[in-house]
Design a protein with these regions (language model features):
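An N-terminally biased module of ancient metal coordination in phosphate/nucleic-acid-related enzymes
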Residues: 1-59
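Active-site-adjacent loop/helix micro-motif of nuclease/hydrolase catalytic cores
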Residues: 15, 112, 223-225
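Catalytic pocket-lining loop regions of alpha/beta-barrel enzymes
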Residues: 100-101, 116-244
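Conserved, mostly hydrophobic/aromatic
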Residues: 7, 33, 94, 102, ...
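Active-site-proximal loop/turn and secondary-structure-junction residues that shape catalytic pockets
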Residues: 10, 47-48, 80, 108, ...
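N-terminal cationic-hydrophobic initiation segments that often serve targeting/anchoring roles
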Residues: 33, 65-69, 95, 157-158, ...
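Active-site gating/metal-coordination segments in enzymes
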Residues: 52-148
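Active-site neighborhood of phospho(di)ester-bond hydrolases with catalytic His/Asp-centered motifs
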Residues: 3-6, 42-45, 75-77, 103, ...
Length: 249
């Protein structure tokens, strides 16, 4: 059985290499997928317009999936305009064009922002899972924002029980352990050392069946491998809600 990679950032045309960023084209990614036995990769979107980084917008990802539907599907994204009333219609258009989810959602607003809650409400109605990147603070790094202990995420999980939330990034996975830091710099780092029972991520997984995990990148990798015994138990317990993925190659 072929596997699915749930988190890729690709381009349609070649992108010049830089010292800090390498973006593969969808054709360049195929050997990697084949080597790992991956039948289909799901593309993350940077938004409705072309992002400052050379990663696929909704339009570009739709174009890639149309060019090679055997190997690629795509998630859509929205640009923040602060108007919740437009969200459902904009996401409906994306779904009509073939989007299978929303991601990577990285609007740098708190999770209780009305626009974001409109996204989550529409996602549940349209059956579009949401992959989010989390930041520790508005104006710091990128991603949706929550406080230490993830109280806003829990409120979203309660408020939108029919929406599937896929957690991703350092600020989410650092909460695997009960001794998760509270300062913004440390919350944006990979976790390390033995996991102390009572972490918020395991607690939220236990309480809310609509929470899922995106295991791409070192953020999730460290969360699982920092304490092998705990990580293996977590993988086994939530095997049907954890998704292996690449992020960028």
């Amino acid at each position: 059985m072929k596997k699915i990679d749930l988190h890729l950032h690709l381009s349609f045309d070649p992108v010049p290499k830089s010292d800090t960023l390498l973006v593969s084209t969808y054709k360049e990614m195929l050997p990697h997928l084949e080597e790992l036995g991956i039948g289909k990769g799901v593309l993350m979107s940077s938004g409705e317009r072309n992002f400052s980084m050379p990663m696929g917008s909704n339009e570009e990802n739709c174009r890639i999936a149309a060019a090679d539907p055997e190997h690629y599907a795509w998630m859509c994204n929205l640009d923040y305009d602060g108007d919740p009333k437009t969200v459902y219609d904009r996401l409906s258009v994306c779904k009509e064009k073939g989007a299978v989810g929303i991601g990577e959602l990285m609007i740098n607003r708190r999770l209780d922002d009305p626009f974001l809650n409109a996204v989550f409400e529409a996602a549940g109605k349209l059956n579009l899972p949401v992959t989010f990147h989390m930041s520790p603070e508005t104006g710091y790094s990128y991603g949706v924002v929550d406080d230490p202990g993830l109280p806003l995420l829990e409120a979203c999980l309660k408020r939108h029980p029919h929406t599937q939330f896929l957690g991703h990034s350092q600020t989410f996975w650092i909460e695997m352990s009960a001794d998760a830091p509270t300062d913004k710099e440390s919350r944006n780092q990979w976790g390390k050392g033995p996991v102390i029972p009572g972490g918020r991520v395991p607690e939220l997984f236990k309480k809310y069946p609509n929470l899922y995990g995106d295991l791409s990148a070192n953020s999730a990798g460290c969360a699982i491998m920092r304490d092998p015994a705990f990580g293996l138990e977590f993988l086994e317990t939530y095997a049907d809600r954890l998704f292996f993925a690449t992020d960028m190659v």
